[in-house]
């Protein structure tokens, strides 16, 4: 774990690590991405409120909570938006969609034997150090692997009669901007990456990006959602178990797609 000295810039904004620390880490040639963090007080915001702002500002976003087996409440809430890469794989067809800083997108499609080989390349390319004072996740891949993903490791396994659903074998996104609620310290941590290829310019871009993130949280527009309404005439025939529950034949029924 690397020390992250606090640096105060104009206006008393707390950011870390220092540019000198980032230079030292870059000289090791071990990391291509160094996380840069800016702190805000969390007394004015909640994870759900920020999620509504991100949902309005970005096509893709997420909210993940952390909790160990010994905790009732997790220390961290992780949020992210504007992924720089979208990676999906279905039946060995791998699609990668990248988005640059100007919003220009590019998509590649190819056949693969195992998508894990591509994922390992991406992880190596964006290898990030663990920094003191920062949470365990400071950016990276977020998404899911379906049950069907096992077929890439067990090629002899035959998956027959697969339901035609919207689920892909793998659906991941690469997030560089991360917003973390540290509930223990009552702080909001804004995190983005400094790429070591062009360190000085990347550092300046990262500082500007952190300011944009802070302004988005403070002044961003909230997404408004319509309330969910289920009409009895349309949905009741799909749930005949309701009568069975009333009659005492079942205590609970959980409906799911797969």
Which residues are covered by each model-predicted region?
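Short, hydrophobic/aliphatic alpha-helical segments
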Residues: 120-134, 241-253
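Extended accessory regions or peripheral subdomains of proteins
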Residues: 11-56, 60-61, 66-111, 147, ...
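Short acidic (Asp/Glu) patches
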Residues: 115-132, 155-166
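Exposed boundary/loop context
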Residues: 4-5, 73, 132-136
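Short, Lys/Arg-enriched N-terminal segments with co-localized hydrophobic residues
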Residues: 2-14
